Amino acid sequence: NLWARLKKAEQAYHIYRKLLTYVEPSGGKFSNYQHGGGTYANLFDAHPPFQIDGNFGGVAGVCEMLVQSHSILQFDNLQFTIELLPALPEAWKDGSVKGLCARGGYEIDMTWKDGQVTELQIYGKRSGKVTVRYNGKERKVNVTPYSDQGQGKY
């Protein structure tokens, strides 16, 4: 999670893979518990008593690798910035996601190839300008809100 926030893609990926290492709770042949845990066969994190921290933290880390968002208050106005693929590891150079949430009530669907965003849709619960960073560029875009007629998007 922290490595992803610091935009250290390979370190974040290494920790994520370590989280997914199979562990036997009994200390058997595949026991890795003393080397930093992993994941049990039931997909619980091997860090009792706080297994939920690892489960939710792992998901949050993946989300941070793909999308980071920030808000700042300027002149009584909240401004949002969304950064796409800020910590993308080499192992994930091609992929897609749907429904990743960002601050400000925004939702992101995107596809990427060779580490570059190729398709992007941003949906919003409210209208407004959002700064979006991707592929080495920064753009201010207008997002329309969800409505009864359909979802707002950029």
Residue ranges and their predicted role:
Residues L2-G152:
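Non-catalytic C-terminal accessory modules of carbohydrate-active enzymes
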